[in-house]
């Protein structure tokens, strides 16, 4: 604990700029002394990865559950690109109404029609995509699905309806959101006001 506190309070000054260091420590309690050191380090590192986005926690301990979770996450990451190409992600629309019950539009919800595991809710993959930054690819895909549906509604005379889509804060780091959305508005000839964005934390 002393070491942790000392490192957490460290400050480095470079060219009049002050940087505070935030420490993440992964701990692997050795069960088998014959195990290669490299594997021990991998397990400690795996533990530290679980708290990288948690600024209130600086120490994490490795356990069997972490290994199983890591394997599951890697499987999702490995299957994600092909799932996008095969359009396994499906948009479900949840109606949005006013106080009188009149429909104003809908909220776009994503589900993964997995070829082996069946229909998966967002709880099964969103956190992993957020953690790895891949969420921007899924968001772009969903925006296009929503824009396409708005275009269909317009042709059917239902252009008064809107669709709300999610946008992750991480999207701002990976893509030009303005350019993507303008492109969709032009491609499907829809009103930009009808594609509403809801920022997720």
Regions found by a protein language model. Give the residues of each.
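Catalytic core regions of nucleotide second-messenger enzymes
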Residues: 7-23, 52, 118, 154-161, ...
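Catalytic strand-loop-helix junctions within cyclic-nucleotide turnover domains
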Residues: 1, 15-18, 22-40, 65-68, ...
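Catalytic-core segments of nucleotide cyclases and related cyclic-nucleotide turnover enzymes
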Residues: 4, 15, 30-56, 123, ...
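Alpha-helical scaffold within the catalytic cores of cyclic-nucleotide enzymes
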Residues: 2-15, 42-45, 142-151
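Flexible, glycine/charge-rich interdomain/linker segments that couple
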Residues: 22, 28-31, 50-75, 159-167
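Catalytic core of bacterial c-di-GMP phosphodiesterases, primarily the EAL and HD-GYP domains
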Residues: 29, 98, 102-107, 134-201
């Amino acid at each position: 604990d002393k070491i942790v506190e000392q490192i957490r309070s460290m400050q480095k000054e470079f060219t009049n700029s002050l940087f505070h260091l935030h420490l993440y420590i992964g701990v692997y309690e050795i069960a088998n002394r014959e195990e290669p050191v490299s594997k021990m380090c991998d397990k400690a590192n795996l533990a530290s990865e679980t708290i990288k986005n948690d600024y209130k926690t600086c120490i994490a301990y490795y356990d069997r559950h972490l290994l199983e979770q890591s394997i599951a996450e890697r499987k999702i990451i490995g299957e994600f690109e092909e799932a996008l190409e095969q359009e396994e992600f499906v948009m479900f629309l949840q109606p949005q109404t006013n106080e009188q019950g009149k429909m104003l539009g809908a909220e776009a919800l994503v589900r993964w029609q997995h070829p082996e595991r069946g229909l998966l809710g967002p709880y099964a993959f969103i956190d992993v995509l957020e953690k790895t930054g891949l969420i921007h690819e899924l968001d772009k895909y969903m925006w296009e699905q929503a824009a396409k549906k708005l275009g269909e509604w317009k042709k059917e005379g239902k252009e008064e309806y809107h669709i709300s889509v999610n946008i992750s804060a991480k999207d701002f780091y990976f893509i030009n959101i303005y350019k993507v959305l303008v492109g969709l508005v032009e491609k499907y000839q829809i009103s930009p006001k009808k594609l509403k964005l809801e920022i997720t934390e």
